[in-house]
């Protein structure tokens, strides 16, 4: 292995200086420490898997030695791009089975970009194999999976960074530091969070033969087997509860995680939710098109709402959170934030926009991926990767540590469970049980399809 420093100057030039430096300081990063060339592998070479990997390549000395995907076309296409992008120009080894990949390679870092139903098994196996893990959110499809992932990270002493990169988003770091932490909001007692994107894939595609390039059996893995009705990539798999937790698990987890970070919140004291398929009744999708949830804390309610139809309440903030204080209001999204004081005595209005780095990283724009990367998320993901590496090198925990990712993910899963059983739920994380509710407790752990075995937090 060769040794070289993380290129601090190269990174700083690419960001708006003040916000970037503020972000680095807030995240506790030290980019001047030496760092080895990390041996990296990616499991899941689709849209966000490649996007995460390429952001890491942009800012740190890494060698991508292996790629794994059950879609032969996806992994071969990704290998070609990686060979063009990484410094060595080497083509990584290709695998259709991640377990074989872990057995045959000594890896420092494994990035997991697979669908939600595979996250837990792959992350735990990667940690057992000696790798640190960067896993996309939500971390799990059920609560006990998440508990097992946290237990594994602690047992094997591995850094696990969750892809909730809003904590590494420069303008949101600025909002936390200069609005929330500065006390400009006053006493905070209510938060609204929402998503009004028309993102619920639907339709009635016919059942069809599985193409030769796709191992659909392994793609399905521990999830229930659905009849094959076309490539599940990008958004089709997200429209089924067999593989995840719908818009609640996909989009609420980001906003709720950011709010918890900004307000220093832990587990909610009680969670409730209502919703269903109220409008988009045609098609195969079985996730909600309308849902509200309440995450309760002492003297504070955090309320979520999503609709995959109609118009957003605020067209400038279709996916966002609003923190209400007695001195002012903060409304924020991945694109911008606005602080609105209640009166002149409470300060002046403040507006900040997302930071782009298209000039420094033109490949962000030209990257031949489909769909295109989220340009607004690229600077945040680079910061997030640097924080991940800093935690590895210093032996600490990253800003989006697996335990924080578990709290945010599990809270959203518990909201879906509340909707299903029709009553509020109180989760005790020490006992890993819902208080006084045997019916709901039975939902904490999904049944796995044979021969897969559900991870046990007591036996990882």
Locations of regions flagged by a protein language model:
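N-terminal glycine-/serine-/threonine-rich beta1-alpha1-beta2 phosphate-ribose binding loop
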Residues: 2-132, 144-159
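Contiguous beta-strand/loop segments that form the cofactor/metal-binding neighborhood of enzyme cores
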Residues: 28, 174, 184-187, 192, ...
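Short, hinge-like loop/turn segments at secondary-structure boundaries
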Residues: 83-85, 152-154, 178-181, 208-210
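Conserved donor sugar-nucleotide recognition element shared by glycan-biosynthetic enzymes
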Residues: 94, 119, 168-171, 381
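Short basic (Lys/Arg) and small-residue
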Residues: 137
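Conserved PLP phosphate-binding loop immediately N-terminal to the Schiff-base lysine helix
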Residues: 142-144, 170
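Rossmann-fold dehydrogenase core element
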Residues: 148-166, 175, 189-191
